[in-house]
Amino acid sequence: MFFTLFRPPFVLAVAVTASAIPAHAMECPEAPDHSTPLEALMGEVQDAESETQAREIANRMWEYWADAPNAQAQAILDRGMTKRSAFDFLGALADFDQLIAYCPEYAEGYNQRAFVHYLRRDFESALTDLDRALELSPRHIAAMSGRALSLYGLSRLEEAREALAAALKLNPWLPERYLADPGGPLAPPGAGDVEL
């Protein structure tokens, strides 16, 4: 979904050191353009033969999505993700707010803040951030699936169904795919109906 990326310990050390730098200390550069390798990985995940293989490919996608525009932005992103993983949702929101204020054109800032909103069951705020993330990065599969889950949380089932279908076209191995299985809450209407 919108979520996780393991960062080695040395990145966390950099994050702690860089956290003392105010976000307004310099202007955020443009986010790196990883569209070419991401498109290649999307092709690979569509051809994956197992869930394990697909997960490995998805993890490589995360490395690109979570590649912030510079070291300062990376430190803020990593710090927020660490706080989120420790269930410090308010601290994570503060970090992602800071990241978005500093790098308003960086999609992952919105995606990560959306995840925190989602975990807090604030689906409307999650949806707003996911829509912005997708404006900036239209084929961000994790944001697409997060959007589907947020719409589902708002009981907007038809929109959730469409959002999940779009994400599954890019990665048919998403963990959320089971929601669209026959009998699932986001299954197409009539899927799984038994004729008598």
Label each PLM-derived region with a short phrase:
Residues S85, L119, G153-L154, L186-P188:
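Register position in tetratricopeptide repeats
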